[in-house]
Swiss-Prot record:
Coiled coil: none
One Gene Ontology term from the biological process aspect of the record: ATP synthesis coupled electron transport
Highest taxon, organism lineage: Eukaryota
Enzyme class at the top of the EC tree: translocase
Keywords: Electron transport, Membrane, Mitochondrion, NAD, Respiratory chain, Translocase, Transmembrane, Transmembrane helix, Transport, Ubiquinone
A single GO molecular function term of this UniProt record: NADH dehydrogenase (ubiquinone) activity
GO CC annotation terms, alphabetical: mitochondrial membrane; NADH dehydrogenase complex
Name used for this protein in its record: NADH-ubiquinone oxidoreductase chain 4L
Originating organism: Locusta migratoria
Cited InterPro entries: NADH_UbQ_OxRdtase_chain4L/K, NUOK/Mnh_C1-like
């Protein structure tokens, strides 16, 4: 595995984790950072599989599950915006009282 590819994947992963931890008030930004993290993990898996000559069925299954995760996140975002008018987590929890 090339060091440049590994460094790129890890820097993308840690920047996604940083955005996920620092901008957690908006659901859309959280979902985008989660997709960013999934993309970096996919790149890391593909680099690992190319390096050791394994078969490529696992990345396809990984992409299917990540697409399902993205679709579920977007459906939660749409239902939250329809019911509350925005994607702030604070307004969502205040209306439960």
């Amino acid at each position: 595995m090339s060091m440049f590819g590994l460094f790129t994947c890890l820097s993308i992963y840690f920047s996604g984790v940083y955005v996920f931890c620092s901008k957690r008030k908006h659901l859309l930004v959280v979902l985008l950072s989660l997709e960013y993290i999934v993309l970096s993990l996919f790149m890391l898996i593909v680099l690992f599989l190319v390096e050791f000559d394994y078969d490529y069925f696992f990345p396809v299954i990984f992409l299917v599950f990540s697409v399902c995760e993205g679709a579920l996140g977007l459906s939660i975002l749409v239902s939250m915006i329809r019911s509350h008018g925005n994607d702030f987590f604070n307004s969502f929890f205040l209306s439960l009282c």
